[in-house]
Amino acid sequence: TFILFTAMSPEAGGLGFDAMQNGWVFAFIGLMGVIIQGGLIGKLTDMFEMNKLMILGTITCGLGIASIPYVPSEMSWLILLSSAFISIGHGLFSPTQSSLLTFESSRKGHELGVVMGAQEGYGALARIFGPLLAGYLWSLTVEGSGFWTYHTCFRVAGLIFIVAALLQLNLIKNSELSKTITRVE
């Protein structure tokens, strides 16, 4: 739906980007990912707790996605700000989630390959059903008015990220609780 929005004509509320302009945006997203995952994530995990970085990444990514349809065509360069939030958020979330899963599975004696395989499997399902849901919502609302416009799929994505952050907070709370119980026993 990102491309559907950026390629949509400015008269319809989009940015009117062509393939080359969209390519530059995706190159920017890739560059930001390299900077975060290739250079900064190690320093950040030394400075901050991984669980906090994971939640910050989830919230940041959600804000970036939810902000996409609010980029005005006359200031289309702001799509880079939304894209930066998305790639920074993903760059914080993805490696910290994998590390936390590795530590937790090792601590609980689970088979690491099974846990990481499940993570990849659920990620693949999200990459299948996420675009299908977004495309479906887009097709239902792109011609709409009022609250039910092309903004809807991005709003729903933002809500999904809020739910994900709340679930992460709950998991971390329960994980810390289980560590406390383990220490007492």
Predicted regions: what they are:
Residues E11-M32:
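Loop-to-transmembrane helix entry
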Residues D18-M20, Y136-F161:
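A membrane-interface helix-boundary motif in multi-pass transporters
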Residues I35-M50, W138:
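Helix-to-loop junctions at the C-terminal end of transmembrane segments
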Residues I59-S73:
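C-terminal ends and interior cores of transmembrane alpha-helices
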Residues I68, R155-E185:
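Multi-pass alpha-helical transporter architecture, strongest
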Residues S76-F93:
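Hydrophobic core of transmembrane alpha-helices in multi-pass small-molecule transporters
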Residues L92-K108:
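Intracellular juxtamembrane helix-capping segments at the cytosolic ends
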Residues G109-V142:
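A late C-terminal transmembrane helix in Major Facilitator Superfamily
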